[in-house]
């Protein structure tokens, strides 16, 4: 039986992963000269209407966009603009493709053309507003931001940009009133606006007002890295170092590693003098774009957020966290070399340099260049002891099957954490998996139970520990309880529903297994493992024709090395997966209390 790789299962430990859906367009044309002379042929080609050329460019651009080539899409959309019907619509597409390909200057040129053609698209107006702010044309920026119709997401960005424009022209008080007038009453939208309000107060030196805003947001459980960093800076600069460290450590535990947060935490802990960063209007405006875009990226599986990261960087080229997320968006779209190019522009002086090197290593690995990835990883580790980078590289080692190196590096991180009185459940989870892969189940089990004690409510962890026990025939009631709870927490997560079904299968309850495995395949129809498991369940319930269909389908989905022969053998003789029963267990690790609330 093939299970998920550690990299796929440990969502909290790896870089943010997204799938970009793409369609394929088959376009075939054929023509024959039919014996035309050179003159006849020339007349035919010269007589081709300009509109036909435009539609040709439009189709090429559409195909390029569908097949994830925004640079070619932008080029051919631009060629189609002047002569095609519905010109402004094509110009809008050309702008999106230009920004998606990272060509801001071309994007501005196309946005101007689209505006001339009468486009009222939000992205056109935002692009022109950003350019006007960048070059100091305040009146043009005001017109684009205040005389345009925006949906909720773009309206939030437009109001943030306008607020920083107001700071520059009318002062802080006017900007704060402007933001207050735009509050929606929805905490999900207003928290970003309130953080922006605090940053504006801080930029003007109104630190008491800024702290009041930040304290209120923190107590409401709002967590925004740039705002939390500013909050901690203010506290530390006033001598409240313990409170600042408490906030930064809580952010790390609840949200995860952030390079800027980690650097600030280290500086405060080392007793360094903390300098409060006062944002310029351009830097603030860049954050007004970046913050909603980062939130969008965490909630969607498309590449729209990448367009906004490019706009933010046009205003503040030093906003390296935007480069990091932009590159991640490119990697999600399998545009590996472009992602590496974006990351290569992060300088060594940046807090995100180490993170960027880890991302480069991952991009190389995912594009099939594992040796280059390992070389970059080794170089990065030699250059920096950054904890976030170490975690990225440990993940990389697991992905390429170097479990011993992964285990050693994770042990080093855990040991260093202990010296700072910190325990991160994700690290014990990862090391437990690596130790299990290395055949050291007792130590792996100890790590996994430690992770459970620290974090009893993570669906991925509950699923992994529960399935591991089922697979070994140990603590079966406890194991099934964990898997069921994971499935209740994540009912639309295919691999968790698969685990629930496969656990029932291993225990001989084939009818229940079939129900869950069918649901898992509905959720993840392109997964070879899930289709393979469903085939086994069908076979055991007498549905042998359907079983063979699922196994054949699994073979078309690129199963892992070694799995193809096993699946092909089942097409001849059926499955041979042994049932499990409660195994004899020794003293072993102490199980935690029942996981049911």
Predicted regions and their residues:
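N-terminal secretory signal peptides that target proteins for export/translocation
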Residues: 1-14
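Positively charged, low-complexity intrinsically disordered regions
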Residues: 3-5, 18, 232, 553
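Hydrophobic residues within membrane-embedded alpha helices
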Residues: 5-6, 20, 316, 473
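Sec-dependent signal peptide recognition
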Residues: 14-21
């Amino acid at each position: 039986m093939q299970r998920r790789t550690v990299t796929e299962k440990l969502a909290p430990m790896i870089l943010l992963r997204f799938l970009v859906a793409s369609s394929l367009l088959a376009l075939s044309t054929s023509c024959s000269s039919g014996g035309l002379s050179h003159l006849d042929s020339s007349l035919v080609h010269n007589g081709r209407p300009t509109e036909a050329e435009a539609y040709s460019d439009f189709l090429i651009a559409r195909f390029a966009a569908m097949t994830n080539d925004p640079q070619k899409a932008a080029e051919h959309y631009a060629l189609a603009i002047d002569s095609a019907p519905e010109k402004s619509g094509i110009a809008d597409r050309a702008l999106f493709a230009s920004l998606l390909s990272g060509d801001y200057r071309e994007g501005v040129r196309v946005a101007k053309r689209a505006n001339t053609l009468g486009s009222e698209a939000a992205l056109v107006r935002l692009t022109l507003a950003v350019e006007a702010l960048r070059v100091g044309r305040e009146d043009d920026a005001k017109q684009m931001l205040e005389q345009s119709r925006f949906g909720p997401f773009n309206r939030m960005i437009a109001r943030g940009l306008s607020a920083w424009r107001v700071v520059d022209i009318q002062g802080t008080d006017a900007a704060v009133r402007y933001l207050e007038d735009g509050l929606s009453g929805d905490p999900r939208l207003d928290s970003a606006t309130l953080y922006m309000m605090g940053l504006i107060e801080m930029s003007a030196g109104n630190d008491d007002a800024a702290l009041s805003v930040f304290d209120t947001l923190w107590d409401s459980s709002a967590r925004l890295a740039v705002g939390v960093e500013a909050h901690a800076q203010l506290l530390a600069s006033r001598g409240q170092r313990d409170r600042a460290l408490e906030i930064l450590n809580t952010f790390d535990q609840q949200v995860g590693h952030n390079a800027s947060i980690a650097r600030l935490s280290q500086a405060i802990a080392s007793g360094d003098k903390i300098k409060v960063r006062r944002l310029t209007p351009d830097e603030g405006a860049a954050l007004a774009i970046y913050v909603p875009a980062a939130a969008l990226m965490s909630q969607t599986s498309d590449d729209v957020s990448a367009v906004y990261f490019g706009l933010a960087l046009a205003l503040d080229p030093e906003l390296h966290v935007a480069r990091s997320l932009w590159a991640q968006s490119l990697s999600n779209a399998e545009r590996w070399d472009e992602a590496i190019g974006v990351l290569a522009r992060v300088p060594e002086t940046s807090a995100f340099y180490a993170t960027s090197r880890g991302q480069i290593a991952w991009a190389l690995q995912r594009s099939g260049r594992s040796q280059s990835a390992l070389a970059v990883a080794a170089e990065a580790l030699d250059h920096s002891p950054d904890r976030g980078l170490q975690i990225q590289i440990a993940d990389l080692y697991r992905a390429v099957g170097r479990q011993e190196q992964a285990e050693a590096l994770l042990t080093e991180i855990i040991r260093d954490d202990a010296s700072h009185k910190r325990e991160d459940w994700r690290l014990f989870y990862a090391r437990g998996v690596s130790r299990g892969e290395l055949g050291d189940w007792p130590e792996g089990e100890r790590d996994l139970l430690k992770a459970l004690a620290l974090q009893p409510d993570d669906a991925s962890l509950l699923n992994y520990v529960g399935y591991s026990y089922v697979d070994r025939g140990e603590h079966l009631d406890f194991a099934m309880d964990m898997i069921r709870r994971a499935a209740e927490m994540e009912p639309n997560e295919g691999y968790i529903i698969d685990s629930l079904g496969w656990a029932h299968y291993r225990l001989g309850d084939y009818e229940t297994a079939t129900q869950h495995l069918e649901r898992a395949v509905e959720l993840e129809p392109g997964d070879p493992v899930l289709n393979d498991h469903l085939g086994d369940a069908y076979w055991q319930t007498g549905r042998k024709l359907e079983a063979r269909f699922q196994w054949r389908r699994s073979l078309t989905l690129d199963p892992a090395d070694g799995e193809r022969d096993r699946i092909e053998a089942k097409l001849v003789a059926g499955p041979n997966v042994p049932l499990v029963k409660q195994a004899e267990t020794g003293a072993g690790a102490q199980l935690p209390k029942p996981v049911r609330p």
